[in-house]
Amino acid sequence: MSVILYTTHCPKCMVLEKKLKSKNIEFLENTDTDLMIAKGFETTPMLEVDGEIMNFVAANTWINAQ
């Protein structure tokens, strides 16, 4: 499973990072804002799991289900 957290280290970003770590989910952290803009992201955090992009709410739901 490929998990990428797109983050600017904002408070919501840190919540997702903490939850991923608490569930022992391995993830890569991406802080490249140019890439985020190129992907069409208007907010952070965003979570990508096996190519599926999730916003904060969807990412929380996914993490909680793991």
For the regions a protein language model found, what residue spans apply to each?
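Local sequence-structure signature of Cys/Sec-based thiol-disulfide redox active-site neighborhoods
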Residues: 1-27
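Short secondary-structure boundary/hinge segments and terminal tails
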Residues: 37-38, 54
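A short acidic, often aromatic-flanked loop/helix-cap motif at beta-alpha or helix-coil junctions
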Residues: 33-37, 61-63
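Non-catalytic, surface beta->alpha helical segment in thiol-disulfide oxidoreductase systems
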Residues: 48-66
